[in-house]
Amino acid sequence: MNQDDRRKYLIKGLLKERPEYEDMQIPSDAGEQKMLLRSLMNIRMPREMDNAFLQIQDAYLSEENENKGIVTLADIREVQPDLYIWKGDITRLGVGAIVNAANSGMTGCYQPCHNCIDNCIHTYAGIQLRNYCNDMMIKQRHEEPTGQAKITPAFNLPCDHVIHTVGPIVQGKLTKKHERLLI
């Protein structure tokens, strides 16, 4: 099965879950298919998926990540001893962990093709990340507080882990309380 076949298989599998999309036609253009697949992954609520789907999704995302290019620590300039700064797509980093600017629900951004980092991380990690985060939040029984963090496996990302943290939501003027929440 090649990437085109995998992508179509995944789209069909996700469309089957949504009766309202039963008549939707899969576009012939690969770029449009990629956007449709990402959209379907983004709006999918956390729930189990069969192993055949997950294996094909994992193969698809692995190849997509390889095609984007994986950046290791050796590729990044050290600015001070043990301090490296990367400007770019963090879903390409093959490092110990990346940090996700998560929302308090911790299950990712549900807006189709939104380019926030939360959406990108959940897309390229695969649907297992949303399921894992959902299970974690069910056990926790409350939203994640600002300034706290949770660590998860990275699933299909080239890094080892994802650290999810919720930043303060500032509406109006920045206050001392907002500043304290950043520490």
Feature names for model-found ranges:
Residues 1-183:
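Macrodomain-like recognition of ADP-ribose-binding/processing modules
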